[in-house]
Structures are given as structure tokens and as C-alpha cells.
Amino acid sequence: MFARLSLCAALFAGFAAVAPAAQVQGILIDQMCSSKAEVHIVAGPRLEGGMIVAEAHTRQCALMPACEKSGYGVFTYDNKFLKFDEAGSRKALAMLRASKKEDDLKVEVSGEIQGDTIKVASLKFVE
């Protein structure tokens, strides 16, 4: 009886720990530059940052050595930045190198979100 109960509890805990796959759209941006896109209040008072800053981010900047090294993520349309896992950053780098797009780096990402990181299952540019 105890063994069955333990097995059921373990199975339930395993299922509860698995997060459902999420699909997110936004702008591909490196982690180093993502802080520029974060919305913040400046003197005036006025807001700076946000999607307009993320959309202005260029492929050229994202491929600079320091930006490459920092890794990549997606700046979402609700003004949040989700870091890619290491494999996702490698996928993003390969896409950026192969792309002719200079800006407007809109992407669709699917994967498992864990805190502020997304474990990338698929990544593609969208129009």
C-alpha cells in the first residue's frame, strides 16, 4: 500500500514539475543590450526604453563580440525580456549570421519557460 502511494506521489510530482511549452513572439536581442530596452523613468518625468528601442536594435550590434558572448533572448510585446538557454543562444547566433536582415528582428520562440529563461525548442524569424 505504501509503495503504491509513494509511486503515485512520485508520478504526480513528476507531472507537476513539467511546465507546458510556451510560444512567445517579440524581438531577438542580445542580453547585453536588453537592458537598454527595459522601460524606466527618467528626468522629466518620462519613460524610456520599451519595444521601440528593441525594434531599433540591429543585427550588426547583435553580432558584436561582446553582444555575442552575452547570449540572446526575446524582448516580448509586454516589455519583458526572456533569456535563451545556451542551446537557444547558439540557435539565435546561427540565425543572425545566416540572415540578411539588418533590423526588425521579430522572432517566434517556442519552449519551456523557467523563471526568466526560455529553454528554446524552436526559433524562427517572422514578418
Q: What are these model-derived regions, one by one?
A:
Residues 20-127:
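OB-fold and OB-like single-stranded nucleic-acid-recognition modules
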Residues 1-2:
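N-terminal secretory signal peptides that target proteins for export/translocation
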